[in-house]
Amino acid sequence: MSSPGTESAGKSLQYRVDHLLSAVENELQAGSEKGDPTERELRVGLEESELWLRFKELTNEMIVTKNGRRMFPVLKVNVSGLDPNAMYSFLLDFVAADNHRWKYVNGEWVPGGKPEPQAPSCVYIHPDSPNFGAHWMKAPVSFSKVKLTNKLNGGGQIMLNSLHKYEPRIHIVRVGGPQRMITSHCFPETQFIAVTAYQNEEITALKIKYNPFAKAFLDAKERSDHKEMMEEPGDSQQPGYSQWGWLLPGTSTLCPPANPHPQFGGALSLPSTHSCDRYPTLRSHRSSPYPSPYAHRNNSPTYSDNSPACLSMLQSHDNWSSLGMPAHPSMLPVSHNASPPTSSSQYPSLWSVSNGAVTPGSQAAAVSNGLGAQFFRGSPAHYTPLTHPVSAPSSSGSPLYEGAAAATDIVDSQYDAAAQGRLIASWTPVSPPSM
């Protein structure tokens, strides 16, 4: 005699089994109304045929990649007339639609030669296979997971030759007994040309319009383009000191002045690794609007951010436009001992200053540096050549005099003695600072 607890447990288990059996029965009945045990009324129709026709009018294209690419539009068919209780498998393959190799010329596809040998026949088996006829008939059969590739790598992918036209075929095979082919169906509107990249822009636009996954890529591209557009104005805006980076390459104009008169050099030479070169990246990533006439060297003199001094140097450059000078204008290095200066400079000197006295350099140095009489006639003022030593200029002296008084053997009637007197009067001795 069974206890009440055992009877209740058996009833609850039966209820659970009945629920499962009922679910299976409902699943089988879902497509049975379209079934035909004789399979005489079997029909296979293409889903979204209007969309396929729009692509066919433009000559549809499908991407093939090494790793495989899914199709769009997705191949879907609706089936009716199968035996609801029989088992079937659905297969898909692709056949050549013609005997041509195609090429895209002047906005249209034209035959481009003989086709390549056909790849080994690849067949895609629908992942729901095998299954009851009722299962296949209850909803459209979608081949959304099939991938097209141009490499023979297996993995259930379909290998196609690029620039060849193909047509998909769907096969229905009855299984679970004597296996036999029931039917094969193909749809001309699903023909396409396999490509590694879309050729027709209209095909690209149509796929983006109707493919929900392509819209995600399009939105990402639009965001990327918008970000680039937002960054471009910031890149094109250059700081106010950028023009000095073009005029004075290899030096930074943001450094504090080491000497109130940088055109005469400094008492202490700074190494090339000085902190003045702390903004090199600003110049390296900025394109110069004009080719720079200066040759960059490591041992370059230090320049201050003294705007009047920079402007005076730029004004003197205006008169050098007609000269093809390979080197820099002369500068005046200062030496506080009898020995010659040891610090190298990218500016060759026409004047040698020793113990506060300025003596004219050799004319050969001027000629070797490309500074002839035409250079001195183009200077802002004209002065007679100096044949005797003069004192170094004071702090109030103009930096323009350094180049104008460098000619030693030039004789010209336009030079007068009054100008020489004014020049000597404005130059005062300079005593070097104690070391």
Curated annotation (Swiss-Prot):
UniProt keyword annotations, A-Z: Activator, Developmental protein, Disease variant, DNA-binding, Nucleus, Transcription, Transcription regulation
Effect of G156C: In NTD; uncertain significance
Any single GO CC term annotated in Swiss-Prot or TrEMBL for this entry: chromatin
Compartmental location: Nucleus
Superkingdom of source: Eukaryota
Subunit (UniProt): Monomer.
Known disease link: Neural tube defects: Congenital malformations of the central nervous system and adjacent structures related to defective neural tube closure during the first trimester of pregnancy. Failure of neural tube closure can occur at any level of the embryonic axis. Common NTD forms include anencephaly, myelomeningocele and spina bifida, which result from the failure of fusion in the cranial and spinal region of the neural tube. NTDs have a multifactorial etiology encompassing both genetic and environmental components.
Reported function: Involved in the transcriptional regulation of genes required for mesoderm formation and differentiation. Binds to a palindromic T site 5'-TTCACACCTAGGTGTGAA-3' DNA sequence and activates gene transcription when bound to such a site.
Protein name as it appears in the record: T-box transcription factor T
Gene name of this polypeptide: TBXT
